[in-house]
Amino acid sequence: MEISWGRALWRNFLGQSPDWYKLALIIFLILNPLIFIISPFVAGWLLVAEFIFTLAMALKCYPLLPGGLLAIEAVFIGMTSAEHVREEVAANLEVLLLLMFMVAGIYFMKQLLLFIFTRLLLSIRSKMLLSLSFCMAAAFLSAFLDALTVVAVVISVAVGFYGIYHRVASSRTEDTDLQDDSHIDKHYKVVLEQFRGFLRSLMMHAGVGTALGGVMTMVGEPQNLIIAKAAGWHFGDFFLRMSPVTVPVLICGLLTCLLVEKLRCFGYGETLPEKVREVLQQFDDQSRQQRTRQDKIRLIVQAIIGVWLVTALALHLAEVGLIGLSVIILATSLTGVTDEHAIGKAFTESLPFTALLTVFFSVVAVIIDQQLFSPIIHFVLQASEHAQLSLFYIFNGLLSSISDNVFVGTIYINEAKAAMESGAITLKQYELLAVAINTGTNLPSVATPNGQAAFLFLLTSALAPLIRLSYGRMVWMALPYTLVLTVVGLLCVEFTLAPVTEWFMQMGWIATL
């Protein structure tokens, strides 16, 4: 019997999302106009809370859909205007270009990145050194590339290796269902469970590595570019400005990596089983023998393009997004990718998030029009200049750990810039606040997958169920890093940021605009 029209409409609305989630969104959409009539300020804060809720529930439904509905309604009822949304999007065009072109550009360098991580995995036998290498490699790559892409590459390596051993363990060469363990005997299951633990720890080290490296440069995370643009910094300026906080945090983060592996705590310490290593090594040897000159040329070309990418970013030869576009053109031209559909695949990872970011800017427009953050900013600015840095860091950290850090970073840097332009703070203080906002947005956000897009990408990937990586387990494994990165970052903002920045100015390395 066919379902009713109403039931069909209900099922289509937000698709497979739970009924309670659909009902919650409908209630939000009904309440917002009613509350806006009574108190625009309260309605504005309610919208922000609802939007954060959609980000926190990203596993139930991609936030673009519910967040987009809320944003459309906000414009429709007058909380902001379509013109203001356009202005916010135009002001952040560089970030949108970064997401569209840089992420797509790195897609065409995946073979090189896969090669690097595969060599690391099979060449280093010490688990402590391997974990450190993965963390450092992810940090270095994320300083120049998009963190999502770096994590995507590591996921590809892990899924590939898991599939190789799973086929051997199940004695089925055509094993397509990697979640089906029914054909694996008891002995192999023990080894497989150990292998899962090994992959879980490597993925978490790599994920945290992207946060450690991503905070250091203006292209490491999308919000970094927003903050750099607001402060008028180029690549070198941004790196030096952040270094009083980010360099000590990087060192402590890498020491944490070694410590958790040494103590075998928080789910770390599992080694690669020897039987698995033998299977993977055999497969890698076969792959290398089958690699043609054409394949080798592709790797060499991608490495040269990587050098171009780093050089162009460091010398600020063009806007970041345009450098990404040059990577697409060079990589496709020189590696033989000429089909439109093959090129189109490169954009599938970045465009949904680009659309979501545009919705962020709609909510930012509401925040500005309704002056939602004015009381908070007023409270912070009442404190001494020294205390302002820590307060901005803490407020950013709290919100970033449960919400998307692009959203949070954009809000706070806009408010700080408005305070500077109104004369409430000096330009020098504003530049220090920009560092506190950037580090506060990036570092504590490793606490949950909601804050770090790379973590959320890992949690929703095909790999997560294979290696038994749940939301709770990810939060638990991230806990030592969360504590170390947050506390060390706060101490650096409190004690080293101002004096080291002053010393940099005296040396002539940086200058106030």
Curated annotation (Swiss-Prot):
The keyword NAD does not apply. Its main location: membrane. The chain crosses the membrane at residues 23-43, 52-72, 97-117, 144-164, 202-222, 238-258, 303-323, 348-368, 391-411, 447-467, 475-495. It comes from Escherichia coli O7:K1 (strain IAI39 / ExPEC). It is a multi-pass membrane protein. It comes from the Bacteria. GO terms for molecular function: sodium:proton antiporter activity. Keywords: Antiport, Cell inner membrane, Cell membrane, Ion transport, Membrane, Sodium, Sodium transport, Transmembrane, Transmembrane helix, Transport. It catalyses: 2 Na(+)(in) + 3 H(+)(out) = 2 Na(+)(out) + 3 H(+)(in). This is Na(+)/H(+) antiporter NhaB. InterPro entries: Na+/H+_antiporter_NhaB (IPR004671). Belongs to the NhaB Na(+)/H(+) (TC 2.A.34) antiporter family. Na(+)/H(+) antiporter that extrudes sodium in exchange for external protons. The keyword Ion transport applies.
